[in-house]
Regions:
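Structural signal for conserved beta-strand scaffold positions within catalytic alpha/beta enzyme cores
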Residues: 38-40, 141, 169
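Soluble or luminal CAZymes and related metallo-dependent hydrolases
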Residues: 48-54, 98-109, 148-152, 209, ...
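Short, flexible hinge/linker loops that cap or flank conserved catalytic cores
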Residues: 2-4, 133
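Catalytic His-Asp segment of secreted/periplasmic serine-dependent ester chemistry enzymes
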Residues: 144-221
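Short, well-ordered alpha-helices that flank and scaffold nucleotide-derived cofactor binding pockets
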Residues: 26, 30, 115, 195, ...
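Active-site segments of SGNH/GDSL-like serine hydrolases
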Residues: 76-77, 110-158, 162-163
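Conserved SGNH/GDSL esterase-like catalytic core that processes O-acyl groups on lipids
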Residues: 6-12, 17-104
Length: 221
């Protein structure tokens, strides 16, 4: 199906868990018959996304006009909620962002996207020109691909509740949990579906999931 015939356009921001060599996002877009715009870059953090947005190079004005859903999958195991560290006006944040405050960077990205959508009502070149409130801003958040990153997973749930955003709960729907070891390997099941491992609180877990559209975990996601 050509992009012109697809009714839904989805923009993804993320890092190594979301880059195109994974496949889950592209598979999801194919299933939805949606046009996917994958702007995930391995090694980036939410601070980098905020900086790209501040420069105006995460998406063009034309792309913003067409995007129906903005998906954020920045899943470093950090607190992304922390309400006491946030600014009411996103213009008050010092730029460029560093990686010292994940909650502030998330707050900037969310408020900046909502504001960009709102401003389209004043843009004569936009299909939302003259529409009260501009374009409805639809943001979709994601947990980590499994439940071991507790700090992030718990705080992204709070952020989702705060804003009323839908949340993709990979950690609840992936098919295994950190609470139970694999009965044969006596290790975390996530290690069977990962290319490498990471240690959290003294336990070894799967880190980067096996990549490629033919991989089980990418299809599960």
């Amino acid at each position: 199906m050509s992009d012109e015939k697809k009714k839904l356009t989805v923009l993804l921001s993320g890092a190594s868990f979301a880059s195109v060599d994974n496949g889950w996002f592209e598979l999801g877009c194919e299933a939805l018959r949606a046009k996917g715009i994958n702007r995930a870059i391995g090694g980036e953090a939410i601070a980098d996304v905020a900086n790209r947005m501040s420069r105006g190079d995460l998406y063009s004005r034309e792309e913003l006009d067409e995007v129906d859903v903005f998906v954020i999958m920045q899943v470093h195991n950090r607190d992304v909620y922390a309400p006491n560290e946030l600014k009411k006006d996103y213009h008050e944040y010092a730029l460029p962002f560093t990686r010292g405050n994940y909650a502030a960077a998330f707050d900037y990205v969310i408020k900046k996207y909502i504001s960009d959508c709102y401003q389209l009502q004043f843009d004569k070149g936009s299909k939302y020109y003259g529409v009260k409130g501009g374009k409805p801003a639809v943001i979709l958040l994601c947990t980590h691909w499994h439940d071991a990153r507790v700090v992030y997973n718990e705080s992204i749930r709070k952020l989702s509740d705060k804003w009323g955003f839908p949340l993709v709960k990979f950690d609840e729907q992936i098919g295994f949990s950190k609470t139970v070891e694999h009965p044969e390997t006596h290790r975390q099941t996530s290690t069977l579906f990962a290319d490498d491992t990471e240690c959290i609180d003294g336990v070894e877990y799967g880190w980067h999931p096996n990549r490629g559209k033919d991989c089980y975990i990418q299809n599960r996601m």
